[in-house]
Regions:
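Short, conserved SAM-binding/catalytic segment
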Residues: 40-50
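N-terminal Rossmann NAD(P)H-binding glycine-rich loop of SDR-like oxidoreductase domains
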Residues: 2-28
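NAD(P)-cofactor binding segment of oxidoreductase domains
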Residues: 52, 59-61, 67-101
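Conserved glycine-rich Rossmann-like NAD(P)H-binding loop of the short-chain dehydrogenase/reductase
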Residues: 28-36, 74
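SDR active-site strand-loop-helix element
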Residues: 9, 33, 101-105
Length: 105
């Protein structure tokens, strides 16, 4: 199987950020989904990740983030909106033909 792009959500958090670092260290192409531009998202860009911005509760933003990725690492905090965010992510990933998803729980 080819080494396609991996989308990491929650990429500016502790778990997502560590995941981005490990994937990049293994030579994978990484698209990091962040909520906003800040020092943490800038650092991910400097490490070599493609950083995109969006809100989990915006289906169109999630659709754009998953376009062209092979696999995804879904990391969403336990807080209000998790059910809707998970549903949007699953829908967008299915529509985009994402091969596999790891769900951090």
């Amino acid at each position: 199987m080819s080494q396609g792009t991996v989308l990491v959500t929650g990429a500016t958090g502790d778990t997502g950020g560590a995941t981005v670092e490990q994937l990049l260290a293994r030579g994978r192409r990484v698209r990091a989904l962040a909520h906003r531009k800040d020092a943490r998202s800038k650092r991910l860009q400097e490490l070599g990740a493609e950083v995109v911005f969006g809100d989990f509760l915006d289906l169109d933003a999630i659709r754009a983030a998953v376009q062209g990725v092979q696999r995804a690492y879904f990391c969403y905090p336990i807080r209000p909106g998790i059910i809707q965010a998970t549903a949007y992510f699953a829908q967008a990933a299915k529509e985009a033909g994402v091969d596999g998803i790891v769900n951090m729980s």
